[in-house]
UniProtKB/Swiss-Prot annotation:
Belongs to the 'phage' integrase family. XerC subfamily. Forms a cyclic heterotetrameric complex composed of two molecules of XerC and two molecules of XerD. Residues 127-330 form the Tyr recombinase domain. The gene is xerC. Pfam families: Phage_int_SAM_1, Phage_integrase. It comes from Chlorobaculum parvum (strain DSM 263 / NCIMB 8327). GO terms for cellular component: cytoplasm. It comes from the Bacteria. This is Tyrosine recombinase XerC.
């Protein structure tokens, strides 16, 4: 049978898709995953169920019986994705979603065996993290001290006040991203109570709502202190009345920052100083890890500060450390 690859499941089909909603509810309740992650699981599994439906010649998703799926069906699904030009990394992610679904069915006694037990995840090349150089990072923050940037703070009126507020906020945002290695979602979710400027640390809520303590360097402490002072003066009416005051970083209207704003902000400030193709908030997280390891920090400590659940993830950054060690060796060793 020819598979209709363009058709998406309709809402009423999704609602009746067998065992999908119990699994998604389990993700939210037991594993504390984010809504964005739940949406990704939903999309991956609906694509899987839709393929099985078409493959079996069924007329609706609710007719798909996960317990009757065989290893060959899963491998056909992987081949179908490859045929569509889906990249191996994306296929591995979709396969991980399907494996999690069947693990849930096994644990809840809905099935007695999983067809995924004999399916091997495609081998992936490790992606080397992109980062800005230490000199580029210095130039990034030097721009805030330049006469050109300070000129934007001059003048009277509301527009000048907004520029001043946003300039101090932007510097604090970038100092925290680079100085603490936070994810974008973690930065946006920071509460005022999570910041301790006296002792110099942040309490960060990461993936799976796991909390960790991250040290604040002096540049980040100073940037936050100045930002909080400007913020107090800018919002003449206490933010407590707006319902938004608990967030550390807000817009000039007192609302919580949103991802696109921080992405645009990061690109705007990095473009003049960095030759890196990527100019997003995550590259500052990569730079934090790379520069920490280059400076001699141990892998376990960096892993804890990044909120990684496994050292394997952090090991991706060691390629830069080895490059740096080779550079030092070549310069220092007489026989190099």
């Amino acid at each position: 049978m020819t598979i209709n690859r363009s058709r998406q499941p309709e809402d009423h089909e999704v609602a009746r898709c067998r065992w999908l909603e119990p699994f998604l509810s389990h993700l939210q309740a037991a594993r504390n995953v984010s809504p964005k992650t739940v949406t990704a699981y939903r999309c991956d599994l609906l694509q899987y169920f839709s393929f099985l439906k078409e493959q079996a010649g069924l007329d609706r998703l609710e007719a798909v019986e996960p317990e009757r799926v065989e290893v060959a069906d899963v491998r056909l699904f992987m081949g179908h994705l490859l045929d569509k030009g889906i990249q191996p990394r994306s296929i591995a992610r979709k396969l991980a979603s399907v494996k999690s679904f069947y693990r849930f069915l096994l644990e809840t006694g809905r099935i007695s065996s999983s067809p995924l037990s004999l399916v091997v995840t495609p081998r992936l090349d490790k992606k080397v993290p992109r980062f800005v150089s230490e000199e580029e990072a210095r130039q990034l923050f030097r721009r805030f001290e330049s006469q050109e940037d300070n000129a934007a703070l001059q003048g009277d009126g509301k527009k000048a006040e907004v520029r001043q507020f946003e300039t101090f906020r932007d510097r604090a945002v970038l100092e925290v991203l680079y100085g603490c290695g936070l994810r974008l979602s973690e930065l946006i979710a920071l509460e005022r109570a999570d910041v301790d400027l006296v002792h110099g640390f942040l309490k960060v809520t990461g993936k799976g709502r796991k909390q960790r303590i991250v040290p604040l360097g002096e540049p980040a402490v100073e940037a936050l202190r100045k930002y909080f002072e400007v913020r107090r003066n800018f919002f003449r009416i206490p933010l407590e009345r707006t319902g938004e005051s608990s967030r550390v970083f807000v817009t000039s209207r007192g609302r919580q920052l949103y991802p696109m704003l921080v992405q645009r902000m990061t690109k705007r400030y990095l473009t003049p100083v960095s030759e890196s193709e990527k100019k997003n908030p995550h590259i500052l997280r990569h730079s934090f890890a790379t520069h920490m390891l280059n400076g001699g920090a141990d892998l376990k400590s960096v892993s804890e500060m990044l909120g990684h659940s496994s050292l394997t993830t952090t090991e991706l950054y060691t390629h830069v450390t080895f490059s740096r060690l080779k550079e030092i060796y070549d310069k220092a060793h007489p026989g190099a």
